[in-house]
Curated annotation (Swiss-Prot):
Broad enzyme group: hydrolase
Protein name per Swiss-Prot or TrEMBL: Probable alkaline/neutral invertase D
Summary of the function given for this chain in its UniProt record: Invertase that cleaves sucrose into glucose and fructose.
Recorded name of the encoding gene: INVD
InterPro entries linked: 6-hairpin_glycosidase_sf, 6hp_glycosidase-like_sf, Glyco_hydro_100
Molecular function, one GO term: endo-alpha-N-acetylgalactosaminidase activity
Length: 534
C-alpha cells in the first residue's frame, strides 16, 4: 500500500486555502471553519495524499458564484415536501407530472430523504428533519407483517405515504416495510440511515435533546438489537438478501454487500456517540465496541483490493485447511474475472463488492466505498487509494455524468443468471452500471475529507451541464452515462438534493462534520499482508 507523499497535492492545498477564505453561511449557528483546527474537523488528515497532480482539472469558472441551477433546485426540492397534519415530514421520491404511472414514487423513502435532510440542515432548516426522525420512529413501533410472518421489532420502513382524507379532514400514514416492494425484501439500510441522520441532526444543530428522548434511545436499541444479535455467522459482517438497500432488485449482491457493511459500521459508530450511559446504553456500547473492532479488521483485511493484493489472490493455493490457511475463503484464482486485471491500476485500490466462502465480487460499488471513507472504515491510506482509483479510472467510474453506481455492468449469460433476465437492469442501465446523480453528494464529501476538492468540482461541473436541462433524471444509461435512463423518472428528489448538498459542501466544508467520522484509533488493527507462495 502506498504511503503519503508530502510533496504532492499542492494544487489541493491551494484549493482548500481558497475554500477557507470564504465567509460562512449561517455563521451565528456555529464557529467559522477557519477558527477550527484541521484535526478537530477530522477531514484533512490526507491533504498531502498521493496523486494530487493528476486530479482532473476543473473548468475556470468559479463554482461558488451563484449558479442558476441552485435556485431552481431549491424550488423543486420544496415542491416535493410532504405534510402530515400541517407539518412537513419528508419529501416524495419524484415529482414527475409527465408520468401517469406513479407506482411508489409519491412516497417518502427513508434512504431517499437523507440528501434532502442534509440540504435542509445545511440551510439552517432543521425542523423538517426533526419531524421526519420522530415520525419514522413512531412507524417503527407498529406491528410489521408480511403474509403470516412477523418482522423484527426494530425494522424500519422502506417508505411511507401520507393519505389525506378531504371528507373527514384527517391525515393517516401507510408504511411499507418490504411487503409492497419488488421482491418483498425488507430494507436493511433504512435503520442505519436513520441513525446516521439522527447524528447529523445532532451535530448540525447542537441539540442533543432529540437523541436523548426515550423514543429515539429505544429506536436505536431496537435497530442495534437486530444487527448485533447472535447467530451462526463466523464473520462480523451482516448477511443480507439481494435487494435490501439502494440496489433494491436482484443484482447478485446477496451475502455481505459492501454498501450494507459500510453503513453498518457508520451506524454503529454514530450510535456510540448518542446512546445514554445508563445500564441499557452501556450494555450496547460494550457490544458495539467489540463488533467494531472485529468488523474493521475483517473489512480492511479481506474486502480491500489493490494491485499487490490482486496479485496475491491470483497466486493463491486452494483447499487449505486449518487456521494457518492463507486463502481463508478458498477463493479459486480462476474465478477472478478478466476485466479486473485491466481495471486495477498500479496506484489505487477499493473495497470490493462482496466476500463470502469461495466467492469474491470484484465489482466497484460507489456508495459503499464513499461511505467507507466518511465513516473511517477505510484507513487514511486506503481512503487516499480509493480517490487515486477514481482519478485513474475517471472515464469508467464517472464518465459524462457522475456517478456510476457500480462497475462494470454484467451482460449476456451472466446477466441472465445473476438478474433473472431483469429488463430494467440491462447492461449499463439502472443498478447495472447506470449513473446516479444522487451519488454526487457522497463523492463530494469523500473528496473533501481526503483533501481532493478538485475531483468534486469536476464532477459537479459535469452534472451542471445537463441535470437541469434534462429535468433532474433519476439515473442515466450508457457506458459513459450519456443517455437519460430508459425508465428514469424526471424531477427525482434525491438527484436534486444530492446536487444541492454537493454544492453546499464545497462552499462550506465545515458541513462535513455532520456526516463524517474521524478514525477511531481503538478499532485500527495492525494489518499484515499475507502471501501465498507457490
Amino acid at each position: 500500500m502506498e504511503g503519503v507523499n508530502s510533496s504532492s497535492s499542492i494544487s489541493d492545498l491551494d484549493e482548500l486555502a481558497r475554500l477557507l477564505d470564504r465567509p460562512r453561511v449561517n455563521i451565528e449557528r456555529k464557529r467559522s471553519f477557519d477558527e477550527r483546527s484541521f484535526s478537530e474537523m477530522g477531514i484533512f488528515d490526507n491533504v498531502n495524499s498521493p496523486g494530487g497532480w493528476e486530479t482532473p482539472v476543473s473548468s475556470a469558472r468559479n463554482s461558488f458564484e451563484p449558479h442558476p441551477m441552485v435556485a431552481e433546485a431549491w424550488d423543486a426540492l420544496r415542491r416535493s415536501l410532504v405534510y402530515f397534519r400541517g407539518q412537513p415530514v419528508g419529501t416524495i421520491a419524484a415529482y414527475d407530472h409527465a408520468t401517469e404511472e406513479v407506482l411508489n414514487y409519491d412516497q417518502v423513502f427513508v434512504r431517499d430523504f437523507v440528501p434532502s435532510a442534509l440540504a435542509f440542515l445545511m440551510n439552517g432548516e432543521p425542523d423538517i428533519v426533526k419531524n421526519f426522525l420522530l415520525k419514522t420512529i413512531q412507524i417503527q413501533g407498529r406491528e410489521k407483517r408480511i403474509d403470516r410472518f412477523k418482522l423484527g421489532e426494530g425494522a424500519m420502513p422502506a417508505s411511507f405515504k401520507v393519505i389525506h382524507d378531504p371528507i373527514k379532514e384527517t391525515d393517516s400514514i401507510n408504511a411499507d416495510f418490504g411487503e409492497s416492494a419488488i421482491g418483498r425484501v425488507a430494507p436493511v439500510d433504512s435503520g442505519f440511515w436513520w441513525i446516521i441522520l439522527l447524528r447529523a441532526y445532532t451535530k448540525s444543530t447542537g441539540d442533543t435533546s432529540l437523541a436523548e428522548t426515550s423514543e429515539c434511545q429505544k429506536g436505536m436499541r431496537l435497530i442495534l438489537s437486530l444487527c448485533l444479535s447472535e447467530g451462526f455467522d463466523t464473520f462480523p459482517t451482516l448477511l443480507c438478501a439481494d435487494g435490501c438497500s439502494m440496489i433494491d432488485r436482484r443484482m447478485g449482491v446477496y451475502g455481505y454487500p459492501i454498501e450494507i457493511q459500510a453503513l453498518f459500521f457508520m451506524a454503529l459508530r454514530s450510535a456510540m456517540s448518542m446512546l445514554k450511559h445508563d445500564a441499557e446504553g452501556k450494555e450496547f456500547m460494550e457490544r458495539i465496541v467489540k463488533r467494531l473492532h472485529a468488523l474493521s479488521f475483517h473489512m480492511r483485511s479481506y474486502f480491500w483490493l489493490d494491485f499487490q493484493q490482486l496479485n496475491d489472490i491470483y497466486r493463491y493455493k486452494t483447499e487449505e485447511y486449518s487456521h494457518t490457511a492463507v486463502n481463508k475463503f478458498n477463493v479459486i484464482p480462476d474465478s477472478i474475472p478478466e476485466w479486473v486485471f485491466d481495471f486495477m491500476p498500479l496506484r489505487g485500490g477499493y473495497f470490493i463488492g462482496n466476500v463470502s466462502p469461495a466467492r469474491m465480487d470484484f465489482r466497484w460499488f460507489a456508495l459503499g466505498n464513499c461511505v467507507a471513507i466518511l465513516a473511517s472504515l477505510a484507513t487514511p491510506e486506503q481512503s487516499a487509494s480509493i480517490m487515486d482509483l477514481i482519478e485513474e479510472r475517471w472515464e469508467e467510474l464517472v464518465g459524462e455524468m457522475p456517478v456510476k453506481i457500480c462497475h462494470p455492468a454484467i451482460e449476456s449469460h451472466e446477466w441472465r443468471i445473476v438478474t433473472g433476465c431483469d429488463p430494467k437492469n440491462t447492461r449499463w442501465s439502472y443498478h447495472n452500471g447506470g449513473s446516479w446523480p444522487v451519488l454526487l453528494w457522497l463523492l463530494t464529501a469523500a473528496c473533501i475529507k481526503t483533501g481532493r476538492p478538485q475531483i468534486a468540482r469536476r464532477a459537479i461541473d459535469l452534472a451542471e451541464a445537463r441535470l437541469l436541462k434534462d429535468g433532474w433524471p433519476e439515473y442515466y444509461d450508457g457506458k459513459s452515462g450519456r443517455f437519460i435512463g430508459k425508465q428514469a423518472r424526471k424531477f427525482q428528489t434525491w438527484s436534486i438534493a444530492g446536487y444541492l448538498v454537493a454544492k453546499m459542501l464545497l462552499e462550506d466544508p465545515s458541513h462535513l462534520g455532520m456526516i463524517s467520522l474521524e478514525e477511531d484509533k481503538q478499532t485500527k488493527p495492525v494489518i499484515k499482508r499475507s502471501y501465498s507462495w507457490t
